[in-house]
Amino acid sequence: MREFRLIFVLLFFLPSFAIANTEIINVETGDSNKLLTSNSVCDIELSNNSSIPLLLKPNPTIPQAAGAPQQSKYTFSVCGLKPLQKYQIRASWPAVYPSDIILNYNITHIIVEINASFYSHNESLMKRPPLVPLRLVVEPLLLGFLPKSVLPIVGFVFVIILIALICMTNLFIKHKRD
């Protein structure tokens, strides 16, 4: 019984070991013929691989000299989306790169806006923050709320609950007999 308590405590604290940031939006494509086809120039092709690794330059915490260009918005075209379908757009990046990321979506493009969100005594670091490694993922939502990549976890949890119910039923029946 002690082993089960230890396993439960370890599973309870397991999420604290996750060291990444994620920004997620759920979108629904409209009933439109403006969606890009696979013949178009695409940054993300939904039929092949809906995940792309990126290195993006964030807006600095301390602005550059007046008039210097500030580029923090990136646009990515998405092909293979189906009309009237719900999708999840997810951006993930390591926690060691503190950044504020804003995701937006229009009919054919994902817009990623990235800003550095840290403070340091090193002024050059504040003016020129390091590039942020980012993974951008687009995947369909099943039943309108469940990302496809979560299905194995849902299946595993379902099996564990089923096994627990069978064990509890057997224990209850055994306890009733005694």
Curated annotation (Swiss-Prot):
Its main location: endoplasmic reticulum. It is a single-pass membrane protein. It is found in: Endoplasmic reticulum membrane. Residues 1-20 form the signal peptide. Essential component of the GPI mannosyltransferase 2 complex. Responsible for the transfer of the second mannose to the glycosylphosphatidylinositol during GPI precursor assembly. This is GPI mannosyltransferase 2 subunit C167.09. GO terms for cellular component: endoplasmic reticulum membrane; glycosylphosphatidylinositol-mannosyltransferase II complex; mannosyltransferase complex. It comes from the Eukaryota. Pathway: Glycolipid biosynthesis; glycosylphosphatidylinositol-anchor biosynthesis. Residues 21-152 are lumenal. GO terms for biological process: GPI anchor biosynthetic process. The keyword Endoplasmic reticulum applies. Part of the GPI mannosyltransferase 2 complex composed of gpi18 and C167.09. GO terms for molecular function: enzyme regulator activity; glycosyltransferase activity. Keywords: Endoplasmic reticulum, Glycoprotein, Glycosyltransferase, GPI-anchor biosynthesis, Membrane, Signal, Transferase, Transmembrane, Transmembrane helix. Glycans are attached at residues 48-49, 106, 115, 122. Residues 174-178 are cytoplasmic. The keyword Membrane applies. The chain crosses the membrane at residues 153-173. InterPro entries: GPI_ManTrfase_II_coact_Pga1 (IPR019433).
